[in-house]
Amino acid sequence: YKFKTSNCTGTVTFGAAGYVAKDKEMPVTLDIFAAEKDFTGVMKVTLPGENGKGIAYQSAVKCKAGEKEKIVLNVPQLGNPSAICFEIMDSFGVTELSEDVSFSDAKNRNGAFSEQAENLIGVLSGQSKELSYLNSLKIGEESDEESVKVVCYSKNSFPQTEEEFQGLDGMIIDSFDTKSLSGKQKSALKSWLKSGGKLLIAGGGQQIDSFEGLEKTFGIIQEDVVVSELYLADADNTVQELPILM
């Protein structure tokens, strides 16, 4: 949802692009703009705990006048996810914004929470509508099926930090020119893959556009089989190999 204080404006998004995966950490993303003066404070998310006591998580917020900042705080899903309190406080502890966020609250349906699913799959594609059939998929045994929800990204909305990938079970890059992604976005994707994220590169005849922009950053080596390797060199020159389906 959108917010406005005496000095700041911005948006707060709960989940991956507004979608929440069950039983996974939930990224809370604050996009903030400070208008007339610098803002220093904290963003705070309070979840319901035992005996009616809330459990709070917070992250520092620093934003210079006339600039925008993005802060991502990952929180576990505890108790009733429909009862979440979001706050922004300044450096003196004065509350600038306090909102109780609810799944059922009409004003949050298209912003804070759009939908819950057992599995969230991110899609970055030039033809995302053609992949909408993935939303009807069920995975697992018939007696224990889990739903799949596709989270569509554009060049502008694609994550810029590893934390923003939290909650996603995988990412599909399909028929998309990855050369248009920023260095921040590529670095975030790289970090997420190193921490266990899964990436599928597709696109048929346009597959070259999908991996060409990642080739230099990641060292993708396309082989004659459908699986390639991603070689990531750490600071100590040790090499980590990660499979990427292509």
Describe every region a protein language model picked out:
Residues 1-9:
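Proline/serine/threonine-rich low-complexity linkers at boundaries of modular beta-sandwich domains
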